[in-house]
Amino acid sequence: MRVSSIEAEMENPIDVDKTDVEGELKIKQVTLLRENIVKKIVFFLVAIFCSDRPSVLKKVFYEEVSKQEEATHVYVLASDLTDYIEEASLKENPEEGGEKSIYFVNRLQKYIYHKKQNKFRAIEYFIQGKSYSEIANNKPLATGRVDQLLAYYGKSEIEINVPSFLTLMWREFKKPINFLLYFGIIVWGIEQMYVSTAITVVFTTTINSLICIYIRGVMQKLKDACLNNTSVIVQRHNGQGYQEITVASNMIAPGDIVLFKREVTLPFDCVILEGSCQVTEANITGENVAIGKCQIPTDHHNDIFKYESSKSHTLFQGTQLMKIEDDILKVIVVRTGFGSYKGQIIRALLYPKPFNKKFQQQAVKLTILMATLLLIGFLSTLSRLLDIELPPLFIAFRFLDILIYSAPPGMPMLIAITNFVGLKRLKNNQILGQDPNSASQAGRIQTLCFDKTGTLTEDKVDLIGYQLKGQNQTFDKIQCQDPNNISIEHKLFSICHEVTKINNKLLGDLMDVKMAEFSTLDIDYDHEAKQHYSKSGNKRFYCIQVNQFHSEYQSMSVVCKEVDMITKEFKHYFFIKGSPEKIQSLSHVQSSEKAQLSTLINEGYRILGFGYKEIPQSEIDAFLDLSREQQEANVQSLGFLIYKNNLKPDTQEVIKEFKEACYNIKVISGDNPITTLKISQELEIVNRKNPTVIINFEETENVKSHLIITEIQPDNSTQVIDFSSAQNEQDYINKQMSYCCDAFLNNKSFCFSGKAHYYFQLKAKTDHISFKPEWVKMQDKSVQKIISFYQMLIINTNVFARTQPEQKQTIVRLLKESDQIVCMVGDGANDCSAIREADVGISFAEADGQFSSSYVSLSTSLSCVKRVLLEGRVNLSNSVEIFKGYLQVALLRYLGFLTLAYFYSSYSSGQMDWQALASGYFLVYLILGCNTPLKKLEKSVFDDNLFSIYNVTSVLFGFTLHILSIVGCVESLHASPIYKEVNSLDAENNFQFETQHNTVLNFNILINFFYVIISNHIGKPMKDRYYKNTIAIYYDLGLIYTCKCMILQVLLILEHTHHGLIFLILLLDQEFSSSLTVQVYFSLPMNLFLPEEFSLNFTQEVKKEKELLICNSSSTILEVDYNLRLNYFQQNF
């Protein structure tokens, strides 16, 4: 073993090479760091507080180094601009002759430094770029070599470490937001408010425990879904020769040659060396259909292996091996663990994209504003506190309370628990939520993007029949023919697919199965020739080569060998089927054929074109060696297959409700523009009474290509808009942009094709244009105009057709960049990347494909989207409600503290407990989590911007009202004949708790709690009315009864009472221990609560101090002597 020389200095930061094992979680740069242990020991609290701020930790506790042996950690900057600090070590790099290189793990993916390229690179088995012949010539690994590879690549398993409950609790408790809580607990402890401290600790621990239990449950479920420990047969070299041994699947290393002899769930990604099979990739794509896989073509020895173009030869981890066509399937393992395709999906789930923190950022700013107001209040009373010689420690407490009450630490926990309750409600409705952060985000959704097939429409399709080109007759069945002389289209229907027969049942893509059934020919497999075939009479039609369907080609094709089993004569055909536009582009099409296609599409059918060409016997070997593009050139179009794809039963009703609620609805489909438009018109997403503009593109050789803009009238007549008068390319773009702007203003609908996306992608490549927001303003005006044109089309278009998976992701990303909150709904197949890109993703797939989405519906009904949106509105409104209410209550309590300190008093520990627990700014907001969503979506104009005029005004109004109520209570008390003044602290130089100020302000706060809860409540259109929350109503009634406010019994009108406003004072026996003596209720205008004849009496000022008005249960008014008052209260309280 050779040891590397690692003394050479390295540049910081170091770039990271792209690989095929990172998936979406890529990293850009790595910086070598050395940890300063002394600083971490001295400033360990800072290290904990900044644990989620790697950039801060880097500056404080680490220093950059340029030598590998000096580095203890690395600073990682990811492609999504998140950053991490990871531990680093030296590891042998077998790709560089065993030299030691610096190595680290980021988000479960291993990276190692490559000296030759001066780049870091994710650890992967090198196969991409190798020729098929090189791969086919791989030999079994030596037994000793396997152990080295396992140490380098890791075990072949997706091992998800479910953190222990205590580990998760520690993560929760060390979040920076909780440090305010700890600060508050320390202050409360010094102030000897032990019960209040205990209540806070218990509630915090309980809420965090529930959250941690939920997280563990989700992770355990994911871990169970990833477990796939099985036994496999592997070929190894033991020094004397090759042998077949059975080992556990997790002990397989990349490069191992494995033999499959039975059906199994694949535990790794592998490439087929020998044999063919049928698999279902439902665990990956969400589509439970049989897919044929075959061995790599050994006769194409110079062809290069690429994962994207070699899917027909690649088996992915998690797929189910349904049928092995021959006795054995020989494969070479290429990707394992989190580097496999499934592993990449799981990594993306475990490390989701950073969510929008706008609400949190606004909350911090509003908290600072409130803290400023409290500081002003504190400073305004400071001179008084100093004049009465209040001990400095007490003044310090009041100052420190600013931090506690302006940024209540329990607030994030309350918001989290309401989100948790929302997820549980969704689970009861067969909707699984993966990310609690998306619970409130669903309430902000503005734009809904839907895949068409399987989402808006049913998964199943019906084959109506077919038409031959130039004929308008639709054949709903194959015409009777001589079985030994069937038509060319009959041959094509029977073999141009990847359908297989398992247990006498045809399995495969639904459209392929329908076509194969339509052909009526028997389908089988020839074990000797190792080929699928169909048969009719004496003829067999063998499939000798398959070009699988790919979104880039929009077609699938086969090379067919027709054999007469009696005469042994044979012919060769090339059959192709796919999008009709694709087939027409490959053949010479007459205008009549285009009109025929247009007629079929306008009837709303889903159309496949099909064609063929016969291959001369002398050319067949050369033809098989041609590329796919060359094989598909110059085919002869035959006609069209006609399918009908019906809407789901509830689609129309649900979409109508979305439209009435003013959501921006977009359909993003891979189907052709006209079919997608017809579905959109049927759902009234597009107004069929208005013209529709289709944006398309056709690349033409030797001619400068531009967008093709076609306008379709309501009567289905079409017109290609002519821009030939443009003087140059920029003028051409300006004219097209001007036309589109006018079309938008005239309420014309737009359909944007995938080829139009390709036009802008081509523009970006040839003209060096960047569509990234941070680069837009740095480019010249002509370029900015193109970017604006593209963005304008994406934002204003409602129908996207012939869209490839990566284009769907681009659409969602551009919508997000235009400040829209986007929800993507798909079936989990070609929509995974777009679903993950969206702010909220919803999938219908009951498979591992579901893990790309925030929510997974176990039913196929579109109503699940409605439920998610309704629940999101509840969570969002609860979050705003809790934030505003919790903050107002905290401010109210702090103002009470300041006021009481002004009069040598403070709240007792018991009163603090009562305020915090029974009166409920804690319990009540927990109960608010039980607010239920509405039954129907309504138009919402809810603004969760905490700095909106309404929200700021309501908070400031509440703040003002609280101050006025405190002033009113104190002034009323001072004017009362029973007022007793307190002029000093108690004998032990502590606050006095048994004072009238204490009781008055305590009851004032309790009553104001109800005002805060009710005034901040957000009902329709976000959630049900407050009175429909049964638990909250009963709880409130219980508090009212406890406070003796259920029945108004005594009203005392004081001299200074303003007309129309009353103070309701309930007197209690002063000997009632240290409890409450006077309750003051500052109400709204009394005529809202009392009959008119009473209002007339109450608005008169009563100047006799000993006159008392008692309103009993029979609503009669009595005048009694003041002495009777105490007797009355002694009997009734």
Curated annotation (Swiss-Prot):
Residue ranges, Cytoplasmic side: 1-6, 54-167, 213-363, 419-887, 932-948, 1019-1030, 1125-1133
Residues at the catalytic site: D451
Class of enzymatic activity (EC top level): translocase
Cited Gene3D superfamilies: Calcium-transporting ATPase, cytoplasmic domain N, Calcium-transporting ATPase, cytoplasmic transduction domain A, HAD superfamily/HAD-like
Binding site for Mg(2+): D827, D831
Extracellular compartment spans: 29-34, 191-193, 384-396, 907-915, 973-994, 1051-1101
Alphabetical list of PROSITE patterns matching this protein: ATPASE_E1_E2 (PS00154)
Subcellular location: Membrane
Assigned GO CC terms: membrane
Domain of life: Eukaryota
Molecular function via GO: ATP binding; ATP hydrolysis activity; ATPase-coupled monoatomic cation transmembrane transporter activity; metal ion binding; P-type transmembrane transporter activity
Main location: membrane
NCBIfam families per the UniProt record, alphabetical: ATPase_P-type (TIGR01494), P-ATPase-V (TIGR01657)
Family per similarity comment: Belongs to the cation transport ATPase (P-type) (TC 3.A.3) family. Type V subfamily.
Protein name: Probable cation-transporting ATPase 9
Species assigned in the record: Tetrahymena thermophila
